[in-house]
Amino acid sequence: MQIVVVGLSHRTAPVEVREKLSIPDQAISESLKSLRAYSDILEVSILSTCNRLEIYGLVKDKNIGISSIKEFLSDYSQVNCEVLTPHLFDFRQEEAVLHLMKVSAGLDSLVLGEGQILSQVKKMMRLGQENQSTGPILNRLLSQSVSAGKKVRAETNLGTGAVSISSAAVELAQLKIGQDNGIDGLVSLKGEKVLVVGAGRMSRLLITHLKSKGCNKLTLLNRNIDRAINLSGDFPDIEIICKGLDELDKSITLSSLVFTSTASEKPFIDLERIKNISLNNKLKFIDIGVPRNISNDVKQHDLIEAFDVDDLEEVVSRNQEFRQKIAKEAESLVKEERIIFLEWWASLEAVPVINKLRSDLELIRKEELQKALSRMGPDFSARERKVVEALTKGIINKILHTPVTKLRSPQSREERQASLKIVEKLFSLMDDEQK
């Protein structure tokens, strides 16, 4: 068995490819079920964010397992495998383990050290367990990866001042507005006519950062207006006007800066829609949804500038140099966690031998105890029998302690296999085919 990962990210694929493979929360269960239907995939889990889709699997054969996952991705996205493959990466065993831990720590993020990815890995673990698609191996890997992410953030300054996708989007708006006014740097958003479409987690973060950059009034649109109203209640210091999506066109005409972050699977703002709206001023769209909420063709309009998540690199590169230095320290911590996981997994090789040894010794204990008790006669009380029973169990546990500890201790594969063979031979644990 081997652990593999197949996926794509902002490093390997542009947003127009990533959005075709984005798996929304409501489709995760069915996708996990489809992946588990492949006979060579024993355990599987899916990580789907705006910047990456990664599928982790415990497979019988690494090459067959990777091919199966690629086949699933092609079927799901309706993109031919030959077209898709150049954008995919795959890692096996040690590299796959290290990759997940680096992802969890924020070391592979567009925004180095961003914190949201850790909660996304936690959700990945929860969904795998709820759908019973993960087992002891992936559950342990995911749990240890979460621990690695927490450790990096606790023991280094990697996350200090780290921007998120949402804060990078707000900074991009500041930069572009500044450039329009001949200013090289970040400008206040006070006075900007801001529209936020969507009322989920990303929109909450957007409003938080908009507030910190001077925005004191905005319009919030959502399909479910009650959700928008509930979100606005968390920001009493900002004037937030809540509306339904049916007022999108009118709201756009009253805005100078529009952020979109919804779970829509298709763009709902395109050039045709914009042409039917009477725009009176220049307008900036910043779309952080994946799949994208805004069609690329809106850029053809003379009054519109449109940006998506791939355009955030301009902001991210401004403050990456400092965290790149800290990332080296963080990566050493992650590699330590990888070693701990791999040693644990290697120790599982000893479990069948340990279980057989325990089983054989328990059988001997029971047989010899029964012989002894039968010689004691009826005068031997039930309480005394319990004492003797506990005594014999304690002796067996004492005998097993040293060999079991040795078999489970960190050692090379060759050393462990040699130890296992010695134990099997000394205690006659081998079956007839092995002898």
Swiss-Prot record:
Q: In which pathway does it act?
A: Porphyrin-containing compound metabolism; protoporphyrin-IX biosynthesis; 5-aminolevulinate from L-glutamyl-tRNA(Glu): step 1/2; Porphyrin-containing compound metabolism; chlorophyll biosynthesis
Q: Which residues bind substrate?
A: T49, C50, N51, R52, S109, E114, G115, Q116, Q120
Named from the GO MF annotations, one term is:
NADP binding
Reactions this protein catalyses: (S)-4-amino-5-oxopentanoate + tRNA(Glu) + NADP(+) = L-glutamyl-tRNA(Glu) + NADPH + H(+)
| Site annotation Important for activity: residues | H99
Residue pairs linked by disulfide bridges in the UniProt entry: none
Q: Write the record's keywords in alphabetical order, separated by commas.
A: Chlorophyll biosynthesis, NADP, Oxidoreductase, Porphyrin biosynthesis
Query: Pfam families in the record, alphabetically?
Result: GlutR_dimer, GlutR_N, Shikimate_DH
Report the record's Gene Ontology biological process terms: chlorophyll biosynthetic process; protoporphyrinogen IX biosynthetic process
Q: Where does NADP(+) bind?
A: G198, A199, G200, R201, M202, S203
Catalytic center residues: C50 (nucleophile)
Q: What is its EC number?
A: 1.2.1.70
Domain topic, free-text comment: Possesses an unusual extended V-shaped dimeric structure with each monomer consisting of three distinct domains arranged along a curved 'spinal' alpha-helix. The N-terminal catalytic domain specifically recognizes the glutamate moiety of the substrate. The second domain is the NADPH-binding domain, and the third C-terminal domain is responsible for dimerization.
Q: How does it assemble?
A: Homodimer.
Q: What else is known?
A: During catalysis, the active site Cys acts as a nucleophile attacking the alpha-carbonyl group of tRNA-bound glutamate with the formation of a thioester intermediate between enzyme and glutamate, and the concomitant release of tRNA(Glu). The thioester intermediate is finally reduced by direct hydride transfer from NADPH, to form the product GSA.
Protein purpose = Catalyzes the NADPH-dependent reduction of glutamyl-tRNA(Glu) to glutamate 1-semialdehyde (GSA).
> What HAMAP family does its record include?
Glu_tRNA_reductase
Membership in a protein family? Belongs to the glutamyl-tRNA reductase family.
Q: What is this protein called?
A: Glutamyl-tRNA reductase
Q: Identify the species of origin.
A: Prochlorococcus marinus (strain MIT 9515)
User: Lineage of this protein's species?
Assistant: Bacteria, Bacillati, Cyanobacteriota, Cyanophyceae, Synechococcales
